[in-house]
Amino acid sequence: MRIAPLAAALLLLAAGCHSAFIEATISNRTPDTLTLVEVDYPSASFGTQTLASGQDFHYRFKVLGSGPTSILWTDATHHDHKSTGPSLQESDEGTLTVAITPTNPTWTFQPINKK
């Protein structure tokens, strides 16, 4: 009788657990250093104090809830900027890239395992 619970536990371990997450990259494609870079997504945010020209910032997060994304940053002349990105759903998984350029940021969301 002890074998059945043990076998069930091993079966669950073998099947593995998978948690949906977003692998995000913020890229500074401007000629100047950006400061106070923040990405807002449903239920949380992340960011970095500075992002040098040509530098990338990587962050991995889990989406809890649903809603839009946005990015805020301050340029070298101390002007604040905001750009709205794609909406995310709680089950979303994939990569999110934001390339900040001298004109406008470019957002790319590539979902995987979309249900």
Say what each PLM segment does.
Residues G16-A20:
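Bacterial signal peptide processing site
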Residues D80, P86-K115:
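Extracellular beta-sheet/turn segments enriched in Thr/Pro/Gly and aliphatic residues
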Residues P5-A15:
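Bacterial N-terminal signal peptides
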Residues F21-E23, D56-H58, T95:
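Intrinsic-disorder/low-complexity, polar/charged segments enriched in Ser/Thr/Lys/Arg/Asp/Glu/Gln
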Residues T30, V63-G65, D92:
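Short loop/turn positions at the edges of beta-strands in beta-sheet-rich folds
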Residues L36-K82, T108-Q110:
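Post-signal-peptide N-terminal segment of Sec-exported extracytoplasmic proteins
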